[in-house]
Amino acid sequence: YVTDFPDDELIQKNGVIPIPHLGASTPEAEENCATMAVNQLREFLEHGNLINAVNFADCYLPPTASKRILIANKNIPAIIGNITKILADRKINIANMLNKSKGDYAYNIIDIDNDAEESAITQIRSTKDILMVRII
């Protein structure tokens, strides 16, 4: 028997598994969950960071440059090399980069030192297996 509210008598019995009460249905918990969701959405919109996403790995990189490229792609070999080559060919320096994958998908946060030329972004977007590109 599993319970999150064991009393003294119940907790003494064999087969009882007491677990912590999470309070997920209390008004306080609902408010905290809403606040957490808003903060996570704001973090994605403002910085491109993914926190507690369902279909992507958590991906958090504090901003280290004035420009940021966000890329979602299929998790396959050589795609990162293709992306970085496009940037290198245009002399766009990568200041910091994070790549995380979960199953069939990967997400990249790339901080760059200079502006990304539109032609570079267009070429990245048109690369096979790239799902999304966003500039912040």
Locations of the language-model features?
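Rossmann-like dinucleotide-binding domain for NAD(H)/NADP(H)
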Residues: 1-63, 107, 136
